């Protein structure tokens, strides 16, 4: 008669292979790997776990949302603060972004940096703070003007003083000799607008008083004659302007006085200008045209017309 196996005999009925498989499953479920580690490795792992700390990380520079926002004119938050002359706010922004050159030198749609706008709005103290924070004074706007060009054009002596503060000999020389897209240096602009104090300051700092603008080679002295400004002429002569420097067409400053009302300027320059640079160049001799034919070669009358094989007499 068949009798069921007793509970204690189940393992024997499964066989040795099934028992080994079950044992491996238990090992895989419960073994964390610690038993296979050496004592030294285990101690090192415990030490590293104890040393784990959560440290706050600073957000990367420029990640602040307000730095990325621009108006339709391309103005940043700093541009707007300067335009609206919010000085306290501007100073706080400059303090926060000090050293962030990409933001400080960002140019709007007119290629104006915050430094350009500080000069335009006549805020020399803001301009000074921007320079200390890292603004580049040699960047140009859409007309090729550096901030110093604008200061000279507007006649803001305080801004000129801030922008020409000692920051290295090479830097100062570069900014003084820079020309805008019309070819004018800062000295040219100061001369054109008649700001004598700025002219004197620029020359004392090393500006080339005889620099020629590229359009026709006029120097500041030529410009002073064109503008009929005798006080500027006197100052430029005092600063060492060359009265015998000629334009690309060969005109000296004295020759530009002919036909102009200021006899004072003519007297000032006449005493110093070479004799051959005082008279206007002679015009072409009109009599030379009398000996020339009335017609050019292409306009001479025909004398060899032929019709039907017969020469025509004209």
UniProtKB/Swiss-Prot annotation:
Name of the molecule in the record: NF-kappa-B inhibitor alpha
Per-repeat ranges for ANK: 110-139, 143-172, 182-211, 216-245
Lineage per the UniProt record: Eukaryota, Metazoa, Chordata, Craniata, Vertebrata
Gene, per the UniProt record: NFKBIA
GO cellular component term of the entry, any: I-kappaB/NF-kappaB complex
Phosphotyrosine, modified sites: 42
Motif Nuclear export signal, residue range(s) on this chain: 45-54
Biological-process GO terms, alphabetical: B cell receptor signaling pathway; canonical NF-kappaB signal transduction; interleukin-1-mediated signaling pathway; lipopolysaccharide-mediated signaling pathway; negative regulation of canonical NF-kappaB signal transduction; negative regulation of cholesterol transport; negative regulation of cytokine production involved in inflammatory response; negative regulation of lipid storage
Glycyl lysine isopeptide (Lys-Gly) (interchain with G-Cter in ubiquitin) crosslink site(s): 21-22
Modification Phosphoserine occurs at: 32, 36, 283, 288, 293
Region (Disordered): 1-41
Family according to the record: Belongs to the NF-kappa-B inhibitor family.
Post-translational modifications: Phosphorylated at Ser-32 and Ser-36 by IKKA/CHUK and IKKB/IKBKB; disables inhibition of NF-kappa-B DNA-binding activity. Phosphorylation at positions 32 and 36 is prerequisite to recognition by the SCF(FBXW11) and SCF(BTRC) complexes, leading to polyubiquitination and subsequent degradation. Polyubiquitinated at Lys-21 and/or Lys-22 following phosphorylation at Ser-32 and Ser-36. Monoubiquitinated at Lys-21 and/or Lys-22 by UBE2D3. Ubiquitin chain elongation is then performed by CDC34 in cooperation with the SCF(FBXW11) E3 ligase complex, building ubiquitin chains from the UBE2D3-primed NFKBIA-linked ubiquitin. The resulting polyubiquitination leads to protein degradation. Also ubiquitinated by the SCF(BTRC) complex following stimulus-dependent phosphorylation at Ser-32 and Ser-36. Deubiquitinated by USP38, leading to NF-kappa-B inhibition.
PANTHER family referenced in this protein's UniProt entry, alphabetically: NF-KAPPA-B INHIBITOR ALPHA (PTHR46680:SF1)
């Amino acid at each position: 008669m068949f009798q069921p196996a007793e509970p204690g005999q189940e393992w024997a009925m499964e066989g040795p292979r099934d028992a080994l498989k079950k044992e491996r499953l238990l090992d895989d479920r419960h073994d964390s790997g610690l038993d296979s580690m050496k004592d030294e490795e285990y101690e090192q792992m415990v030490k590293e776990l104890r040393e784990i700390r959560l440290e706050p990380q600073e957000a990367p520079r420029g990640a602040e949302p307000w730095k990325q926002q621009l108006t339709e004119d391309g103005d940043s938050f700093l541009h707007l603060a300067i335009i609206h002359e919010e000085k306290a706010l501007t100073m706080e922004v400059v303090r926060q972004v000090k050293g962030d050159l990409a933001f400080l030198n960002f140019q709007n749609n007119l290629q104006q940096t915050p430094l350009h706008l500080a000069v335009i709005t006549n805020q020399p103290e803001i301009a000074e703070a921007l320079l200390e924070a890292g603004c580049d004074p040699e960047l140009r706007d859409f007309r090729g003007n550096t901030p110093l060009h604008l200061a000279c054009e507007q006649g803001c002596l305080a801004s000129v003083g801030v922008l020409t503060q000692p920051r290295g000999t090479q830097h100062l020389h570069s900014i003084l000799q820079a020309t805008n897209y019309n070819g004018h240096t800062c000295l040219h602009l100061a001369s054109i607008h008649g700001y004598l104090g700025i002219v004197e300051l620029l020359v004392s700092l090393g500006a080339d008083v005889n620099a020629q603008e590229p359009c026709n080679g006029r120097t500041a002295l030529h410009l002073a004659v064109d503008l009929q400004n005798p006080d500027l002429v006197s100052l430029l002569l005092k600063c060492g302007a060359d009265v015998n420097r000629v334009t690309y067409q060969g005109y000296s400053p004295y020759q530009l006085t002919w036909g102009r009302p200021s006899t004072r300027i003519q007297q000032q320059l006449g005493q110093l200008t070479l004799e051959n640079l005082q008279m206007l160049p002679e015009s072409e001799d009109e009599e030379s045209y009398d000996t020339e034919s009335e017609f050019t070669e292409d306009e001479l009358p025909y004398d060899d017309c032929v019709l039907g094989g017969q020469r025509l007499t004209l």
